[in-house]
């Protein structure tokens, strides 16, 4: 499996979320709402999730292997850093509270 595209929307809010990404795998499957979070040990990727009735969060989609998780993390964070350097990049969109 290869990550063939990463789309990124930077988020400018007070919280730790820095961006929301969508990834395409093998030009055939897209996963939306992947979050880039600024954690205590640097940036990390959080998979899309929803809140259950009892208040817990459950992943909607997630990689099964650590190798695949690492591929996703590297691709998304690399795109986040690339877009940060070039605000006029074609995939750059700004999102967040006005």
Curated annotation (Swiss-Prot):
Protein name in UniProt: Putative septation protein SpoVG
Pfam families named among the record's database cross-references: SpoVG (PF04026)
Family indicated by similarity: Belongs to the SpoVG family.
Keyword DNA damage in record: no
Keyword set, alphabetical order: Cell cycle, Cell division, Septation, Sporulation
PANTHER family in the record: SEPTATION PROTEIN SPOVG-RELATED
Cystine crosslinks: none
Function, in words: Essential for sporulation. Interferes with or is a negative regulator of the pathway leading to asymmetric septation.
Matches recorded under InterPro entries: SpoVG (IPR007170), SpoVG_sf (IPR036751)
Gene name of this polypeptide: spoVG
Domain of life: Bacteria
GO biological process: division septum assembly; sporulation resulting in formation of a cellular spore
